[in-house]
């Protein structure tokens, strides 16, 4: 299935039905009074996150999604039927934005998360509601309200813990296929990867993390060159970036240091926040470097690249060094996850609504005071 991570659609909620102005007409009931029912509410449009969907292709060609209108009210106190709601199923990680106002409507981050993106109009009131002591036969009624109508932008950002960065043919797809259950296409030419791939890396029972491989970047990607710039958004939710560098390129004229610096520059141009994410350096294809030259080549690269962060030497093809890297990544993610939970607990403890519980008062109320 083709990978589509962006779409624009129009969602139209149903209009509310009109109220009815009707009088009760029955034999032996000379002054029946009003009996006009209310109109039904219009149907709403909902978005639901579904982990079994991984693309927005259903919305690339289906541009208009409209719920049904509510039925009009009728006499004999008959209320109009409400319009049926419609549900749009989208991948987990979809961001829904109003194109006219720029408002963030929803960020679908959990399976089965449901958000209303267009509300149906309220039904009108029948003349039954306007009866009073001075107006025993009201003729007034109200019309239904129109439903919301929106042009929305759908943007998919995959949910992954770790993202892979690197030039085309750096070995990213080989690495993700070596350490996870992902089976991306692998070949000896650039841009083999045309869409993001996700893989689950398991380091033990109930111990795993998700890794994302995106198409390789080239110089000028932030201005639109190549394929990588349009997929960089998929790395914005990650907690760690692995910068994979080919230390043994087939073309001897290629400088690994220059390529690595180009990746860093493109990252900075695209998004400063993404550039500031924790980043580890992974030197790949060391099986292609003679063993007696390996240490010197790694040292020379680190010196020229001016890198002082974590460094891992691997061979994605043979698996050398991959296991240690995966364990280190898992430990890092677990440590920072615990730190984040601790920070949230501190924020909660500082909340004035919970001070009673901190002081041991079991009867202290939770939540805002009246």
UniProtKB/Swiss-Prot annotation:
Function field: An essential GTPase which binds GTP, GDP and possibly (p)ppGpp with moderate affinity, with high nucleotide exchange rates and a fairly low GTP hydrolysis rate. Plays a role in control of the cell cycle, stress response, ribosome biogenesis and in those bacteria that undergo differentiation, in morphogenesis control.
UniProt-recorded name of the protein: GTPase Obg
GO cellular component: cytoplasm
Location (main, coarse): cytoplasm
CDD domains recorded: Obg
GO MF assignments: GTP binding; GTPase activity; magnesium ion binding
Binding-site residues, GTP: 166-173, 191-195, 213-216, 284-287, 315-317
Pfam families named among the record's database cross-references: GTP1_OBG, MMR_HSR1
GO biological process entries: ribosome biogenesis
Subunit annotation: Monomer.
Keyword Hydrolase among record annotations: yes
PANTHER family: DEVELOPMENTALLY REGULATED GTP-BINDING PROTEIN-RELATED, MITOCHONDRIAL RIBOSOME-ASSOCIATED GTPASE 2
Signal peptide interval: none
Subcellular location per the Swiss-Prot or TrEMBL entry: Cytoplasm
Domain OBG-type G stretches: 160-334
The organism's taxonomic lineage, starting at the top: Bacteria, Pseudomonadati, Pseudomonadota, Betaproteobacteria, Burkholderiales
InterPro entries attached to this UniProt entry: G_OBG, GTP-bd, GTP-bd_Obg/CgtA, GTP1-OBG_CS, GTP1_OBG_dom, GTP1_OBG_dom_sf, OBG_GTPase, P-loop_NTPase
Region spans: Disordered: 127-147
Keywords, comma-separated and alphabetical: Cytoplasm, GTP-binding, Hydrolase, Magnesium, Metal-binding, Nucleotide-binding
